[in-house]
């Protein structure tokens, strides 16, 4: 996961 909050679309996880 990136520095984005959980639940938000994360391109690094896509």
UniProtKB/Swiss-Prot annotation:
One of its GO terms (cellular component) is cytoplasm. Keywords: Antioxidant, Cytoplasm, Metal-binding, Nickel, Oxidoreductase. Its cofactor is Ni(2+). It is an enzyme of class 1 (oxidoreductase). The keyword Cytoplasm applies. The keyword Lyase does not apply. Belongs to the nickel superoxide dismutase family. This is Superoxide dismutase [Ni]. It comes from Streptomyces griseus.
